[in-house]
Amino acid sequence: MSDRILCKFFVHGSCLKGENCEFSHDSKDPPNNVCTFYQKRICLYGSRCRYDHVRAASNLPLSSDSESLDRSISTTPSRHLQQQGDNNDGDKSSNVYCIHPREYPICSFAAAGDCPRGNQCPHMHGDLCNTCGKKCLHPFRPEEREEHTKECEKKQKHIEALKQSQDIECSVCLDRILSKATPGERKFGLLTECDHPFCIQCIRNWRSSAPVSGMDVNSTLRACPICRKLSYFVVPSVVWYSSPEEKKEIIDIYKAKLRSIDCKHFNFGNGNCPFGASCFYKHAYSDGHLEEVVLRHLGSQEGETVITDSIRLSEFLGGLQIF
């Protein structure tokens, strides 16, 4: 056994430095499984992290005896708390290194399914999640428990939706949409005003074809091929909905995603978007502020109110014919 710390990458079989590694590759050497990202409060894995979530020493009372520090970390939470209580009763002046149960990490093996150490495991075993069936809920971290529960329910809901969508066929090509050859074709094209299923490729080809001369675009291309109801846009989705509420949620998520993408026609204020206020994409100028939508209302001779698009001076001057 050497004095070096065991390489954490070697433990997981992923060290790329080999013999040139400055850490030890001897499994008998002491490991250092403390998560440095957690100490900086930037660990993104939470309870799923494979390393120990222990706060930095500056945030905790310092111990005068390094041996007691090692002993407190290596013992189980329940055993450590019991030792702490005994020390406090026997010697009021002793300086005990105290760690709140919230700081103990849960066992990654138990969280994944089964811990080979059982009751001898030095880590805390989490509570059972009723959704995923894993013991991954930390008993003393309510925020993590709530976050995991919501995320787990969301994943389970998505899996159930995928199962229900397996047998849905396209109303045009009559193929099962989720059984198509390429991943890009395995998407539904949802129409906002009807519930007929289409694959995204078929409905887009239908709406992009050239209209017959003299026929209205809305009645020929933007209408559903089956029921002829008019839908102004198509929503791509990897699952098929089972209720109007689920359909509305899919459409809202799609619109919210488009609102985060800059409109190529608006071009940060240098272009002109033909869709105007109806555009789903973000109309933002180069300095970051959003375009202020101002609708122009014009009254006709028949008493009707018409909303007109904004007219630029360059477009007006470009349309003049000077003889």
UniProtKB/Swiss-Prot annotation:
Alphabetic keyword roster? DNA-binding, Metal-binding, Repeat, Transferase, Ubl conjugation pathway, Zinc, Zinc-finger
Q: Zinc finger regions (C3H1-type), where?
A: 1-28, 29-56, 101-128, 257-286
Recorded hits in SMART domains, A to Z, give:
RING (SM00184), ZnF_C3H1 (SM00356)
MF annotations from Gene Ontology: DNA binding; ubiquitin protein ligase activity; zinc ion binding
Q: Does the keyword Lyase apply?
A: no
Q: Where is this region: Disordered?
A: 62-92
Pathway given in the UniProt record? Protein modification; protein ubiquitination
Composition bias, Low complexity: 62-74
At the top level, the lineage of the source is Eukaryota
Q: What is the enzyme's main class?
A: transferase
Stated EC number for the protein is: 2.3.2.27
Q: Which GO terms describe its biological process?
A: protein polyubiquitination
Zinc fingers classed as RING-type: ranges: 170-228
Question: What protein am I looking at?
Answer: E3 ubiquitin-protein ligase makorin
State the species of origin. Arabidopsis thaliana (Mouse-ear cress)
The region called Makorin-type Cys-His is annotated at 129-158
Reaction(s) catalysed by this chain, per the record, are: S-ubiquitinyl-[E2 ubiquitin-conjugating enzyme]-L-cysteine + [acceptor protein]-L-lysine = [E2 ubiquitin-conjugating enzyme]-L-cysteine + N(6)-ubiquitinyl-[acceptor protein]-L-lysine
What role does it play? E3 ubiquitin ligase catalyzing the covalent attachment of ubiquitin moieties onto substrate proteins.
Instruction: Name the CDD domains for this protein.
Output: RING-HC_MKRN (cd16521)
Please list the residue ranges that the record marks as compositionally biased, kind Polar residues. Answer: 75-87
Q: Which gene encodes it?
A: MKRN
Give the residues annotated as coiled coil: none
**The organism's lineage?**
Eukaryota, Viridiplantae, Streptophyta, Embryophyta, Tracheophyta
Looking up PROSITE patterns in the UniProt record yields: ZF_C3H1 (PS50103), ZF_RING_1 (PS00518), ZF_RING_2 (PS50089)
